[in-house]
UniProtKB/Swiss-Prot annotation:
Regions that span the bilayer: none
PANTHER family: ARGININE--TRNA LIGASE, CYTOPLASMIC (PTHR11956:SF5), ARGINYL-TRNA SYNTHETASE (PTHR11956)
Originating species: Helicobacter pylori (strain Shi470)
PROSITE patterns: AA_TRNA_LIGASE_I
Protein EC: 6.1.1.19
This protein's name: Arginine--tRNA ligase
Keywords attached to this entry: Aminoacyl-tRNA synthetase, ATP-binding, Cytoplasm, Ligase, Nucleotide-binding, Protein biosynthesis
SUPFAM superfamilies the record matches: Anticodon-binding domain of a subclass of class I aminoacyl-tRNA synthetases (SSF47323), Arginyl-tRNA synthetase (ArgRS), N-terminal 'additional' domain (SSF55190), Nucleotidylyl transferase (SSF52374)
Key word ATP-binding present: yes
CC per GO annotation: cytoplasm
Quaternary assembly: Monomer.
Length: 541
């Protein structure tokens, strides 16, 4: 609808037209500030230009039946859509059902490689991982809905010092809790009940002879054993959030290609030796300084592994590569992009989205840390507390790059202060009305819209605006727009519902048709957010 209006106006005016939503609904459904843009060109007041253009648009043959009114107001041109136009779009939308708002694959479709979560398999997923996980999953859903091809991948950091430290931590816990030895722990180690659980499970699962081997052998075996257990638990946690990956890439397997990658970096004159280390000349590409890839002891840095992994990704020739990282990785972006340039790739194809910190409260107090995981709040604990859908909604309700703080008790309330409940309640009200209605759904669908007042038309317009919201949410990586849209539409519906009777009016079927459109838009929006909308819900109010 938005695209059609924009196209018609640009054809008439032969200028690029920006379409906005007026802040005041009394000004219409759409507005354009084009008169301000043309004021300097024509050396006229925007007010005069707006009047001239409004007349040109309203009298043009292509807008007949499209608008009820085209009005110049303070330099803006405001448009009110005709009921006939809204009716045609409503009929088409209701026929499309769950495909309403989607786009077919086309020449504009992209092939997107989306990597997210990629948490080290050294512990359970905590709440800090959940935000990026939910965002990435919903972004993929929206991209596919818009006709793009998406591969979702989890990069498993299954080698290196952190994996050995995991094995060492389990070994020390085994000695303390199974062998009942007195153990001195190092300054840095993985702690929490989950480490003790793994140690006890290893005692049951692994051959007793293992624990008679030398310590390095024991630690190596326990590292792999614990890593596999944690990866299974991570997958279970993701499943509980409704998240499923297309592939899991092993750092250990990917890193087997390191020699070929380093050979290409050398040929590109990207490396040099200094202080017995091998450095990447990343400062040539906007990095703050050059970065070490191989340390004095000949071991590789984390960056080296990441470079090899990105080379493997870029070999697959996707249109766009999106990484979702924690905000603390901000300084890491330039060095990875530098390596891509040295390897002959276009680093502009890589977009890195940063997930800011999450702070959970309960009764206005910091949420209790998990004993099982030490100083972390586990995803599973919060899902058990408030449910998957509420957690997903709240994580998507703010821009990814802004800090998020919320009290989980809000998500348990059955009133308008709980946004997800308020939206479910709107849909529940609609389905309850349909059940009570003497009309069949087919009768309602076939009823033409001929007698709607301004408020009813605006509610219908809001429900029909979903496609543009989906599109802009994807283009701007602003998935919070989907949440805001659903909240606003639900609020508008509740206002409509509370304003007067719906079933006991001569135009009941027309009003029910609007309700069906609202329900469809709420349902499709929630589906893209990874939330199942409810058709039945109890209410205290």
């Amino acid at each position: 609808m938005h695209t059609l209006i924009k196209g018609v106006l640009e054809e008439i005016l032969e200028e690029e037209v920006i379409i906005e939503y007026p802040k005041d609904r009394e000004h219409g459904h759409y507005a354009t500030p084009i008169a301000f843009n043309l004021a300097k060109v024509f050396k006229k007041s925007p007010l005069v230009i707006a009047e001239e253009l409004a007349l040109k648009i309203s009298t043009h043959e292509k807008t007949q039946g499209l608008f009820d009114s085209v009005v110049a107001c303070k330099g803006y041109i405001n448009f009110t859509l005709s009921l006939d136009f809204l009716e045609r779009f409503t009929q088409k939308a209701l026929e499309l059902k769950e495909k309403f708002g989607s786009q077919p694959k086309s020449e504009r479709s992209q092939k997107i490689f989306l990597e997210f979560v990629s948490a080290n398999p050294t512990g359970p997923l905590h709440i800090g991982h959940a935000r990026g996980a939910v965002f990435g999953d919903s972004l993929a859903k929206i991209a596919r809905f818009l006709g793009h091809e998406v591969l979702c991948e989890y990069y498993v950091n299954d080698m290196g010092s952190q994996i050995r430290l995991l094995g060492l931590s389990v070994w020390l816990a085994y000695r303390e809790h199974v062998l009942k030895e007195s153990v001195t722990y190092p300054e840095v180690f993985y702690k929490g009940e989950y480490i003790i659980e793994i140690a006890k499970k290893a005692n049951n699962d692994l051959e007793p002879s293992l624990f008679k081997e030398n310590e390095e052998t024991i630690i190596e075996v326990l590292s792999g054993y614990a890593k596999d257990l944690m990866l299974l638990e991570i997958k279970d946690n993701l499943d509980a959030l409704g998240i499923h990956f297309d592939s899991y890439a092993s750092e250990r397997e990917v890193f087997k290609h390191k020699d070929a990658v380093f050979e290409r970096l050398e040929k590109a004159n990207a490396l040099y030796e200094k202080d017995s280390k091998i450095w990447l000349k990343s400062s040539l590409y906007q990095d703050e300084s050059d970065r070490v890839l191989i340390k004095e002891d000949k071991s590789y840095t984390y960056l080296a592994g990441d470079i090899v992994y990105h080379d493997e990704k870029f070999k697959q020739n996707y249109t766009k590569y999106i990484n979702i990282w924690g905000a603390d990785h901000h300084g890491y972006i330039a060095r990875v992009k530098a390596s891509l340039e040295f390897l002959g790739y276009d680093s502009n194809k890589l977009e890195v989205l940063l997930a800011q910190m999450v702070r959970l409260l309960k009764d206005n107090e910091p949420y209790k840390m998990s004993k099982r995981a030490g100083n972390f709040i586990l995803i599973k604990d919060v899902i058990d507390d408030v449910g998957k859908d509420a957690l997903r909604f709240i994580f998507l309700s703010k821009r990814l790059d802004t800090h998020l703080e919320f009290d989980v008790n809000t998500l348990k309330k059955q009133d308008s202060s709980n946004p997800i409940y308020y939206i479910h309640y709107a849909n529940s009200r609609i389905h309850t009305m349909l059940e009570k209605s003497p009309f069949s759904k087919e009768e309602v669908l076939q009823t033409p819209l001929t007698d709607l007042n301004a408020e009813e038309k605006y509610l219908l317009f809001s429900a029909l605006s979903l496609p543009k919201i989906i599109e802009s949410s994807f283009e701007e990586y602003g998935l919070q727009k989907m949440c805001e849209y659903a909240k606003t539409l639900a609020s508008e519906f509740h206002r409509f519902y509370n304003a007067g009777k719906i079933l006991d009016t001569p135009k009941a079927k027309e009003l029910l048709k609007i309700c069906l459109m609202v329900s469809l838009s709420l349902s499709n929006a929630f589906k893209l957010l990874g939330i199942e909308i409810k058709t039945k819900i109890s209410a205290k109010d």
